[in-house]
Amino acid sequence: MKMETFLVCLFHNAAGLHQQIQEILYLLRMHIYETNLYLKQELSRLIYPNRQLSFVLLMPLSLLRNWDDIEYLTDIVDDKQTLHYAANLLTIYVLHLSMYQKLTKPYFLLAVKRVSEKLNKKQRHSFYEVLVTSETLNNYENLPKNILNTLMFAVRYVFKPTPNYSEIIAELEKKNKIHHIIFNMVITDFQQIREQHMCKHLCETNNELRQECKEIIFDLKVVGNV
């Protein structure tokens, strides 16, 4: 097995390793990405054949600052499989970088925005649905607060530029237990109508959701503009 391929396997199975080992792997990975074009291509090939999207979403921030590389996001296609793939990569990406506090809002949102811009309203809604229900986020209750807030911010951004209050409420009503990330997005994006509509709606339809609304409003005020 080539050393580069071995390192790729290490990177993808590092979740259970001690944090110090993870940090070493992260720094090593950054160095390899910056010096080894072969590994960039190899990683992209292993994750998703003939797609550069994986390379863009998984690269370290030092490379993500390269605007030319960001253009690879235009490789997104319209099928459902790719939406699932892109959404899961985004969640993996933000989780990985958040572990080392390497994440800064503009760079992650840039990737989210570039994917979102390639989709029409229906496709963007599907992408949003996949993102907030992806396998990674199903374990959101175990996520540190800073990671959850970052994911919340990303979901808000994906659903723009034309968020529709009625559509989001309809989506909430489809779920027996509301997802914290969707809920945070709704409250943050619709602060103007929260008191008039959101609380009234929840109070009339679901006491459990009403209580959950109260519990997270304080967190949002503390977080502010994440």
Swiss-Prot record:
Stated induction or repression of this protein's expression: Expressed in the intermediate phase of the viral replicative cycle (immediately after DNA replication).
Keywords, comma-separated and alphabetical: Glycoprotein, Host-virus interaction, Inhibition of host NF-kappa-B by virus, Late protein, Signal
GO biological process: symbiont-mediated suppression of host NF-kappaB cascade
Kinase in keyword set: no
First and last residue of the signal peptide: 1-16
Entry keyword annotation includes Lyase: no
Annotated glycosylation sites: 164
Entry function: Plays a role in the inhibition of host NF-kappa-B and IRF3 signaling pathways. Mechanistically, promotes the degradation of host IKBKG through enhancing its ubiquitination leading to inhibition of both pathways.
The family this protein is said to belong to: Belongs to the asfivirus I226R family.
Designated name of the protein: Late protein I226R
